């Protein structure tokens, strides 16, 4: 049976395609955030582990943020509270981490 692309039975395929398209749009933003975090961390003389601990997140999660990838093929999408905790630990404004980014 062939299900037309707009049919409700084919909604999963449509969502997957849309999600992939959104991921592609978010890659540059996730990578830019990762670079900004890395630069700010290095400027403060902190290790990834020390910054993660100060922000209350795992080192593994922080490493994923710097890389910009949550799992293979998926851009990182941190919570606002995580961004605030990292900005606080780095003694920078959240805007310095995310300001000026666009798709």
Regions found by a protein language model. Name each.
Residues 10-45:
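A short, Lys/Arg-rich alpha-helix, primarily the initiator
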Residues 37, 48, 83:
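Generic structural marker for isolated residues within well-ordered, non-membrane alpha-helices
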Residues 46-71:
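Short alpha-helical DNA-recognition segment
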Residues 76-96:
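DNA major-groove recognition helix of helix-turn-helix/homeodomain DNA-binding modules
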Residues 102-103:
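Helix-turn-helix/homeodomain-like alpha-helical modules used for DNA recognition
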